[in-house]
Amino acid sequence: VALVWLRQQGEDRYEVRRAGNSLRLYTNGVFHSQYNSAEPVTGSVWDLLLLPAFALRSGRPSRVLVLGVGGGAVVCQLNRFLSPDLIVGVELNSVHLQVAREVFGALASNVCLLEADAREWLAHYRGPGFDLVIDDLFGHVGGETERAIAADASWCSALWSVVAPGGALVMNFESEAQLRASALCRDRVIRRHWAEAQRFSTPHYANAIGAFFRQAPEWERFETRLQVHPELDQRRAQCRLRYSRGLCVSHQGLCDPTVKGGLGRRLPQVPSRALHHTRNALLET
């Protein structure tokens, strides 16, 4: 594994290493992001965060909000497969943003990367809603990754406030148990906001991805939309997409997962400082 980029900032050491054709971002030895432009689908968590968008009734999210950019893998995947009109990425760590722009190549004209605390940014945001909101806010403690913001009623309500009609909220959890314990599954008031809740997972990671839809998703068109892209077409032997999905909760109570297909995991950083700024002209387009 070759070291291709290094930054020491105070006590924090940031490295980008090349493993084969993949670039990997490490912060203090903790793996945060991976992307390979030649093989953008790896069977990891980044695939899971992307997949729910293919079930939206619109067929494609026009406006996307990513909370926890890390090295920008999800941003690159979104543009590779869905080409939204706008992707807003909010990231607390300035070095991660530098890596996303300069190393991972998250530089497209439709991408607006902001250095900000996710909680502060949401509290101040007054623009239009987003068709897809991705919460991938992770930090690390003692060399282990963990969610940076608890999925309690306050945080989940703040997230729902920026999900557009017909949109979806996608959240990365450390485990299925953590997903099911979240306010999105347990709080009866918050549960009224969504029409369906799905759980995505992969055999390679313990993470569970929760996808909460404002309108009933189009699963009957889901596979057809994936198959447009060779990298997402599981009929092809070279396809690395591996996932399972199923209802994680219904309006009547918790349900058992069902359908198999293919998915994975990932990790960002801890929001603790308020670094707030917004490009209103871009966000309101």
Role assignments for model-derived ranges:
Residues 128, 169, 273-277:
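Intrinsic disorder/low-complexity signature
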Residues 24-32, 139, 168:
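Short, basic/glycine-rich phosphate-binding loops at helix/coil junctions
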Residues 163-169:
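Short glycine-dipeptide loop
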Residues 6-7, 18-19, 38-162, 178-186, ...:
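The AdoMet/dcAdoMet-binding core of the Class I SAM-like
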Residues 2-18, 24, 32-37, 55, ...:
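SAM/dcSAM-binding transferase cores
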